C-alpha cells in the first residue's frame, strides 16, 4: 500500500507513480470516502447541530419568501445563498475551513444583494462589495434599529471572513488536507 500524500513526501511519491496509477488511487479514495470519521467528536457534533439549526431556519425563510412571490430576482439570489450555506456546512464538516469561510463570504454578498434588489434591482450589477454594503446602509430593510444591527453583524462577519481570503497569517491553519487524498 502506498502511503498517503504528505507535503514532504509528494515529490518522491510522484516519481514512483504514473498518472494512471495515481488516478486509480484517487478513484479508490472517492469510492471509499466516508464522513463518519469526521463526526466522532461530540463537541464538533454540537457545532454542526447549531449550524444546521441556523441553516434550516434560513431555508424556511427562503421557502416562505419564494411562496409569497416578493421578488423573483431576490428568489434566485436567496436560493444561491442557500446553496452557499449548505456547501459551507459540508466543507466545515470535513475540516475544510478555508473553503467553508469562502462560501460564507459569497453567501453574505448574495444575501445583501438579494435584500437590496427588492427595491433597487440595479444592485445586481454592482461588483464593489464596499458599494453593496454602502447601499445596504441606505436600504429601507436595514433602516430600522433592528435592521441596522443585523447589517452591522453581517458586515462584521464579512470582515472577519475577509481575513481568510486576504491571507491574514493570524487566521491561517496549516491543515493536512492533502494527507486525506490518496
Feature annotation, model-predicted:
Residues 63-70, 113-122:
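Short low-complexity stretches enriched in small and charged residues
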Residues 94-97, 121-124, 143-145:
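Inter-helical turn/loop segments and adjacent helix faces that build the functional surface
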